[in-house]
Amino acid sequence: MLDRYQDDSFKQKKTERRVKIAVLDSGVAKSAARGPVPPLMKSPRVKLGKQLDPALPWNCDSKGHGTHAAGVILTVCPYADVYVYRVCEGNEAIDRKYVAEAINDAVEKKKVDIISMSLGWDENSDLGLRAAIERARASSVLLFAASSNEGIRTKAGMAYPARALEVIAVDAADVHGNPSKFNPPQLRDKARFTALGEAVRSTYPLHLPSEDPDDGFKRMVGTSCATPIAAGIAGLVLEFARQRPLCFEPAIEAHLKSVEGMRLILTKCLSHKYADNSPFNHLDPTILFHCTERASDGGGFSEYLSPRSSAAYNIVTKLREEFSPDIGMQMGVELQKEWARGGQSSTEEN
């Protein structure tokens, strides 16, 4: 559905740049000098974020998790550029200063839209990391983090930074949307989203052992695998906001780049409750982004009741109800102009 306007020629309104997603993990297998490179990692959309330490080359991955996460993001949101920050070598403890430095660079230098962090700790005593997270929110950068890491269970019930108010926490679910048993306990007043986190198949370094019969792929499990999926879904939302008709009104994207706005749309438009009394909302992008037999590409942006226009109005309606009744007015004015020029009528059936 998003393919139709991904290279939109409507340059006056559509944001030129692609959605940018930073992944803080174990690097990616992109250097041919270290062995064969998984085909997807050869993409020019996989880019250096910042070399945080000479001992941590960004284009190498001795653990495999970073390559897996980057592949997940590009599979879910193929429109994005992925910026790689290698914050660890393998299974050793992650230095918080690397994470803080990566966040600061992603926000200030690379101007990313989303940061995916498949990591976490028991406590949040590092002032530099807390400041970086607060700076990211102030700069309208969306932060996603795994709700648990390597079996961490804390008194708070969730790892940090996932439990921070500025961060969207991600739990895991199986292929049917059932919450994984290894998710941490419920945190009071913390929105909980699940994404596929069991048997997640993605790219994997060819020089590392994998049980997958296809070289360069592996199935992995954990909230750390669900996190890049959620980040990719958020990337789809921002890409859609940069296409017509939503791009007619820049304030819509601004709302979506706030943690409150993105949480709202993920809850109301892109997920379903696992059960009435469950704290978990399972993310499913096909709830919002889907096509029909008559509109296999989602339809035109000004076509009444096309899947594209319906998705756009769904987002606008939820934002309007939560934030301001004026949201969508500018978009409506531009659509009226389009209809006056001979576009699809606002009342005509497809």
Residue ranges and their predicted role:
Residues 1-83, 98-101, 105-110, 114, ...:
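Active-site core segment of subtilase-fold serine proteases
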Residues 13-16, 136-138, 162-163, 185-187:
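Extracellular/periplasmic catalytic domains that process cell-envelope and extracellular macromolecules
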Residues 25, 157-242:
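Extracellular S/T/G-rich loop segment that most often corresponds to the catalytic His/Ser-adjacent loop
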Residues 27-29, 118-122, 148-152, 174-176, ...:
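Catalytic metal-binding/acid-base residues of hydrolase active sites
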Residues 67, 71, 227-235, 260:
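A structural signal for well-ordered alpha-helical segments within the folded catalytic domains
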Residues 68, 88-164, 214-228:
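Substrate-binding/access-modulating region of protease and related hydrolase catalytic domains
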Residues 83, 142-144, 168-169:
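Structural detector of well-ordered beta-strand residues that form the stable sheet scaffold
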Residues 107, 113-116, 239-350:
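C-terminal subdomain of the subtilisin-like protease fold in secreted/lumenal serine endopeptidases
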